[in-house]
């Protein structure tokens, strides 16, 4: 089987994976269920590989998947303006150069204690 169903329809599953991938790129570490962590590892590694390529086509492919969310906002006192960085800009300017010498294996999954409500196996997925 090429993917996990995760108890959702295909459109819901794709939306959830896009959201989790974007959240991981912004925060660099998230807590989720073990199955979701294993599933988003594939897409995050693909996005970082696109970021390492760095050309226009790779940027457009990544933009088609990663949500257009603000990763950080900075205030410049001199110009009295706010500057914001999107998740896509962070991927190409900060994350991809960090892994320039690394061939794959950009994420780490750490298993944690089960969730309190339903005892679902939980995990922390983070960028190495």
UniProtKB/Swiss-Prot annotation:
GO terms classed as biological process: translation
GO molecular function: structural constituent of ribosome
Cellular component GO terms, alphabetical: cytosolic large ribosomal subunit
Domain of life from the UniProt record: Bacteria
Pfam families reported in the protein's UniProt record: Ribosomal_L17
SUPFAM superfamilies membership: Prokaryotic ribosomal protein L17 (SSF64263)
Keywords in alphabetical order: Ribonucleoprotein, Ribosomal protein
Stretch forming the signal peptide: none
Similarity-based family: Belongs to the bacterial ribosomal protein bL17 family.
NCBIfam families linked to this entry: L17
Subunit comment: Part of the 50S ribosomal subunit. Contacts protein L32.
Protein name according to UniProt: Large ribosomal subunit protein bL17
Source organism (scientific name): Streptococcus pyogenes serotype M5 (strain Manfredo)
